[in-house]
Amino acid sequence: MELKHGFGGALAGMDMTWVTDRIAVGGGIWHERNMIEVAAAGVTHVIDMQIEFDDTRLAEPYGVRVLWNPTDDDFRTKPAALLQRGVDFALAALDEPGSKVFIHCAAGVHRAPMMALAVLRAMGWPLDEALETIAEKRDVVDFADVYVRSVEEFIKSYDGAGK
């Protein structure tokens, strides 16, 4: 059995951290064994922020719906349309009873936490509480200032959010 090293050198399975009871953040799924873990955890929807790999074909056999929302981890301002797609997908998913959303990128450090922040902000969470909750639950998160600013610029134009 191939073992994957998690952060800090610890051996780990799927890199997934629940930041709320229905929203998880983590690293890449990459192969079927990890997709099986994701589906077994009750995840019904995946927002894949990594440009490196599209999870759609891996997810199909397990009935998991995927939004491939790829973006480079380039520390540049992210367009509102990117955040809008993810927020729309997540909120529609969360409207379904029993659904759970996994938001991931390659390592779960920058892009996925940015998208999770956008989702929580769109749900009405205050910025400080959303940042703190994500960072406390997933200690490898590194909120790049430019990504937080991208989310806040998006939220300014998002109807009814962040209030």
Which stretches of residues belong to each language-model region?
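Cys-dependent protein tyrosine phosphatase-like superfamily
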Residues: 1-101, 107, 115-163
